[in-house]
């Protein structure tokens, strides 16, 4: 499977084309739009989330509620585009451009992207570099999550840490409703109250906040990925997918950093055979060994830096005059940490769905289900 996205933050729409989805997968807007709404939620979001009410439009590859095997095309309209039609017009003219951005923002793609693509109006960089693009990736990832659910695989995400405030309540699959009901995607009500106070103060200060997200999947078969070549290792693919999301700066699988300072005898997960299957009493590896799923729960933590657009901007340089200036102000969030967990679950879900279709093949969902069931039986009997 593969996909491409296109579109700018204030362009008419975001578009995605997905190739390789098996036919006969039940699919409709009801499988996609709830994930788009989750992405827009969370305490600390900005005014853009009030303007946009994201919905996916399925344009090809789905008929009568099922995939056909043809490429799936979907679009998400940018409602804010009506305020930017002249500024974002593809037609020549209008120089000097309206709302040209020439004061590069530290921490953004602005300066480096401007040099790379020879733009002096840095809006030509930020429009595509914007995290608005993640709406398309959430739509794509939600389809992957739908495929995984049809194969008996379930995912979850929550905020482990926001601005140094940790969720102290250990993750439980029984707490998913509490996570979904929380505007900070944490089951820990006390931690959530502290997080809100920290966000409110940061907003008053014109500052932004980062955090750490945790994503989990259960029900994965043994053997997704490979140890044979570097580019087939699943942990490498997961890390790449996570770090490709705007503002993500670090990835941990299992208890990686905690394990780094321990002796091996206190790190690795002992293997047992009971009740007709292989099992581990601990999961320090986070469900991945040597680039392959081992049948245990997949546990991934991702560090998100604070958003780089500040209401009290940092010093910078104007790329036209080369004079010192303050960084440009753009509408932004105080924090998007809760939404980031949703995005990360979707991008990791895509990697897992891709790995499953690569390993088991098949043109249709029933074929994939049959082959996966056979692989599960073999692993249990091995």
From Swiss-Prot:
Catalysed reaction, written as an equation? 5-O-(1-carboxyvinyl)-3-phosphoshikimate = chorismate + phosphate
According to the record, the residues making up region (Disordered) are 89-113
Its needed co-factors are:
FMNH2
What detail does the entry give on cofactor binding? Reduced FMN (FMNH(2)).
Amino acid composition bias (Basic and acidic residues), ranges on this chain: 94-108
Output the GO biological process annotations, alphabetical, semicolon-separated.
amino acid biosynthetic process; aromatic amino acid family biosynthetic process; chorismate biosynthetic process
The entry's keywords: Amino-acid biosynthesis, Aromatic amino acid biosynthesis, FAD, Flavoprotein, FMN, Lyase, NADP
Residues annotated as binding FMN are 128-130, 246-247, 290, 305-309, 331
Which EC numbers characterise this protein's activity in its record?
4.2.3.5
Q: What is its EC class? A: lyase
Please indicate if the UniProt record lists NADP as a keyword. Answer: yes
Which pathway features in its UniProt record? Metabolic intermediate biosynthesis; chorismate biosynthesis; chorismate from D-erythrose 4-phosphate and phosphoenolpyruvate: step 7/7
SUPFAM superfamilies, alphabetized: Chorismate synthase, AroC
Residues that, per the record, bind NADP(+): 39, 45
Cross-referenced InterPro entries: Chorismate_synth, Chorismate_synth_AroC_sf, Chorismate_synthase_CS
Q: Which GO terms describe its molecular function?
A: chorismate synthase activity; FMN binding
Domain of life, source organism:
Bacteria
One Gene Ontology cellular component term attached to this UniProt record is:
cytosol
Self-association state and partner proteins as the record states: Homotetramer.
Q: Which family does it belong to?
A: Belongs to the chorismate synthase family.
- Its job: This reaction introduces a second double bond into the aromatic ring system.
- Which PANTHER family does this one have? CHORISMATE SYNTHASE (PTHR21085:SF0)
Which protein, by its recorded name, is this? Chorismate synthase
The species is Deinococcus radiodurans (strain ATCC 13939 / DSM 20539 / JCM 16871 / CCUG 27074 / LMG 4051 / NBRC 15346 / NCIMB 9279 / VKM B-1422 / R1)
């Amino acid at each position: 499977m593969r996909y491409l996205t296109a579109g700018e933050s204030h362009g008419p729409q975001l578009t995605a084309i997905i190739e390789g989805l098996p036919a006969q997968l039940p699919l409709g807007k009801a499988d996609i739009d709830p994930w788009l709404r989750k992405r827009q939620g969370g305490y600390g979001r900005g005014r853009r989330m009030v303007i946009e009410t994201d919905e996916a439009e399925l344009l090809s590859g789905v008929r009568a509620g099922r995939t056909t095997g043809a490429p799936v095309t979907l679009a998400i309209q940018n409602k804010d585009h009506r305020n930017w039609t002249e500024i974002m017009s593809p037609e020549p003219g209008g120089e000097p451009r309206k709302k040209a951005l020439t004061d590069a923002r530290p921490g953004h793609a602005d300066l480096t992207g401007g040099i790379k693509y020879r733009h002096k109006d840095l809006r030509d960089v930020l429009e595509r570099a914007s995290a608005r693009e993640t709406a398309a990736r959430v739509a794509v990832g939600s389809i992957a999550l739908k495929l995984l659910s049809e194969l008996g695989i379930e995912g979850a995400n929550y905020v482990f840490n926001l601005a140094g405030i940790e969720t102290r309540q250990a993750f439980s699959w029984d707490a998913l409703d509490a996570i979904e009901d929380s505007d900070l995607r944490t089951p820990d009500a006390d931690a959530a109250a502290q997080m809100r106070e920290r966000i409110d103060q940061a907003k008053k200060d014109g500052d932004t906040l980062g955090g750490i997200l945790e994503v989990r999947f259960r029900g994965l078969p043994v053997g997704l990925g490979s140890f044979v070549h570097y580019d087939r290792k699943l942990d490498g693919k997961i890390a790449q997918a996570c770090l490709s999301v705007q503002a993500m700066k670090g990835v941990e699988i299992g208890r990686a950093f905690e394990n780094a300072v321990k002796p091996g005898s206190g790190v690795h997960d002992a293997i047992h055979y009971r009740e007709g299957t292989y099992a581990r009493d601990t999961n320090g590896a986070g469900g991945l060994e040597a680039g392959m799923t081992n049948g245990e729960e997949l546990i991934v933590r991702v560090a998100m830096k604070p958003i780089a657009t500040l209401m009290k901007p940092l010093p910078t340089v104007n790329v036209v005059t080369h004079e010192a200036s303050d960084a440009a102000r753009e509408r932004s969030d105080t924090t998007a940490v809760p939404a980031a967990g949703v995005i990360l679950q979707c991008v990791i879900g895509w990697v897992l769905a891709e790995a499953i279709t690569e390993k088991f093949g098949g043109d249709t969902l029933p074929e994939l289900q049959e082959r996966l069931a056979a692989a599960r039986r073999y692993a249990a009997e091995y």
